[in-house]
Curated annotation (Swiss-Prot):
Protein name in the entry: RNA-binding protein RMD9, mitochondrial
Major localization listed first in the record, in broad terms: mitochondrion
Disulfide bonds listed in the record: none
Keywords associated with the record: Membrane, Mitochondrion, Mitochondrion inner membrane, Phosphoprotein, Sporulation, Transit peptide
Lineage of the species this protein comes from: Eukaryota, Fungi, Dikarya, Ascomycota, Saccharomycotina
Compartment(s) of residence: Mitochondrion inner membrane
Post-translational modification: Phosphorylated. Phosphorylation promotes binding to RNA.
Record: transit peptide: 1-58
Gene from which this protein is expressed: RMD9
Topology class, membrane: Peripheral membrane protein
Length: 613
């Protein structure tokens, strides 16, 4: 496998890993020795019949299309803004707006375009005629980076998700609508004169972020048959098409290999993105020879330019694929061990949690003992802590994947299962809130004693319960044989945490946790229905606003019996319910009534009286 570059040396060192995992009768095929210099260069493709697609290329369409010569008045406001239009760092809406300083959400300067504004202007033919290749590429780049950064910010930052949910949803809708609009215009051919492979790569990449796989395949199949079909055969574009075609089974593996082989020439450099995706697909198909060929091809490019980020990223990605997707566990484990080492690789491998959880799952399926799997999990967790990985995202994903696989193997609390769970907890390099929350969320065992012991770990390990912790505990109590009073105590502890955190209202997530532990608790739902209705009757006015209350009641319409019961709280001054219990509201510092629930929700019950019959 690895051509390791010795520190301070000019020559590469070939270690023995390739010879260990690659059949001795095979030969390693590498690409050209020409230097890779650009991630947007275009690679020749001379076969005009690709799996039945007739590729048409005008001689004027090569690589980046030429800019149109248009005479425009100097006073044209859009042309003046286009002259200054550049790729800008994206800032999510919920970070732009600060209620304390009254900052505006959209603080784009007059010299730039917002995503929404540019998307709307694209509908205007006059505006489209003013665009050149750079303008369109910058817009596509801003779409792509905006989508990536917005999602990364939401996943990695500690924010009030109830508060930010609407703005985050609105931003996602803006970005998704914009890329779909751009995709539609590109498919009509109206932007062919300013279209380039690098722009298409950003468009396909954005569609991929939204998992719009059908749109990717449809755009590619349309584009490859157009007058600029050669642009759709650029290696960076094909890298995404191959991935999506494989995931959706639009292309089988033989067809993917045909696309790859027909797009590669022996004397031309293979784009690292294409080598990366082909290597990943090959690993998933169990074709390790092809995957290792792709890896060695990338190592050739690395030796020519050790600082090329696209090559380094592609090497790391194929490495991860061997760990997470290889069913040959001997190969997967060798790549895993190399990835955990801080030294010894010429590229940096970020041990991404989804690949690690897949590796753990494959090890269990492949017959590794649970003790061995627990040790792998322990070492990954330790690695994350040492590398200062974000605990909220990476560790949460890792723990969720591990415990999911663990409880799939041990769905019942046998002695062996309990001992192994204790071993996992004792082996964990750090028992923190993320680990305990994830463990309790995935626990299928309806054993009150075990559940309570896990809850005690918060105190034993000095872990402070957050609002999320209290919600998870309340929700998971649905399967535990608690009394109504014990469920009510968990509810009160949640409210106490909300009040301590400065919440003035009971959020939807809190009502959802209560509903799960009572009305939706399966075998306990009958005895806990009265508890739910009693709590709702007391705290109904503590909802966030009128909209939240209306949506709350509307969500019950799908359950006719429950809707009739809950509607009594709106329609009756003092409704009586079977199994009702006494609920006292303590003194709060922050939590308070915000609405008149009965008055607000009357519009829901009045909308269709037949539902109450």
């Amino acid at each position: 496998m690895f051509r390791l570059i010795a520190s301070g040396a000019q020559q590469g060192l070939r270690p023995s890993l390739i010879s260990k995992v690659k059949p001795p009768t095979t030969t390693t095929t590498t690409s050209t020795t020409s230097k890779f210099t650009s991630t947007t260069q275009h690679f020749p493709f001379e076969n005009n019949n690709l799996l039945g697609y007739q590729v048409r290329n005008n001689s004027s369409q090569a690589g980046v299309a030429s800019e149109p010569k248009i005479s425009l008045p100097e006073t044209d406001v859009y042309q003046q803004k286009l002259l200054k239009y550049n790729i800008k760092k994206h800032e999510p809406y919920h970070l732009k707006f600060n209620p304390k300083t009254k900052n505006q959400r959209n603080n784009d300067s007059a010299s730039s375009f917002s995503i929404d504004e540019f998307s709307q202007l694209l509908q205007d033919e006059t505006f489209r005629n003013q665009l050149n290749e750079k303008h369109l590429f910058v817009y596509a780049s801003n779409l792509y980076s905006g989508t990536i950064n917005s999602r990364r910010a939401r996943l990695n930052k500690s924010k009030n998700r109830d508060k930010d949910q609407r703005s985050a949803f609105r931003e996602d809708m803006t970005l998704q609508s914009a890329v779909l609009n751009l995709t539609e215009i590109i498919s009509t051919g109206e932007l062919n004169s300013v279209l380039s492979a690098r722009t298409l790569f950003k468009v396909f990449g954005t569609l991929l972020q939204f998992k719009l796989n059908d749109e990717i395949v449809n755009l590619w199949e349309t584009g490859v048959n157009s007058d600029v079909g050669k642009l759709y055969l650029a290696h960076e574009v094909l890298s995404i098409v191959i991935q999506v075609g494989h995931e959706t089974r639009r292309f089988n593996y033989d067809e993917i290999k045909q696309i790859y082989e027909m797009s590669v020439k022996e004397d031309k450099t293979v784009h690292p993105y294409l080598s990366d995706r082909m290597g990943q697909v090959a690993v998933m198909e169990g074709d390790y020879v092809t995957a290792l060929d792709a890896l060695e091809s990338l190592m050739n490019l690395y030796e020519q330019n050790p600082n090329e980020k696209s090559v380094l990223g592609a090497l790391a990605q194929i490495h991860l694929s061997f760990i997470g997707h290889s069913k040959d566990l001997a190969i997967a484990e060798r790549f895993f061990e190399k990835g955990l080492q801080k030294e010894g690789l010429p590229y940096s491998v970020i041990m991404k949690a989804p690949y690690m959880t897949s590796f753990l799952s494959n090890c269990i399926a492949g017959g590794y003992s649970m003790e061995e799997v627990i040790d792998f999990w322990r070492r990954i967790s330790k690695h994350y802590l040492e590398q200062d990985f974000d605990l909220i995202s990476s560790q949460s994903t890792l723990h969720a994947g591990f415990f999911k696989s663990f409880f799939e193997k041990y769905p019942e609390p046998s002695k062996e299962a309990i001992d192994l769970l204790n071993l996992a907890i004792e082996s964990a390099p750090k028992v923190n809130e993320v680990l305990l929350n994830t463990l309790i969320s995935n626990l299928p065992w309806a054993d009150k004693e075990i559940f309570n012991k896990l809850l005690n770990l918060y105190q034993e390990k000095n872990v402070t319960k957050s609002i999320v912790s209290h919600r998870i505990i309340l929700k998971q109590s649905k399967q535990i044989e608690y009394t109504n009073e014990e469920i009510l105590q968990l509810w009160n502890e949640l409210l106490g945490k909300l009040d301590e955190a400065g919440y003035t209202y009971i959020a939807n997530a809190d009502w959802s946790a209560l509903r799960a532990s009572t009305m939706f608790s399966g075998k306990f739902s009958y005895q806990r229905t009265g508890l739910y209705l009693s709590v709702l009757g007391k705290y109904k006015d503590y909802m966030q606003n009128n909209f939240a209350a209306i949506q709350f009641l509307r969500n019950w319409v799908r359950d006719a019996n429950a809707y009739r019961l809950i509607s009594k709280i709106t329609l009756e001054e003092n409704p009586q319910f079977d199994g009702a219990i006494k609920v006292d509201i303590p003194e709060f510092d922050s939590l308070r009534p915000n609405i008149n629930y009965r008055e607000v929700t009357k519009q829901v019950t009045d909308a269709d009286p037949r539902l109450l019959e």
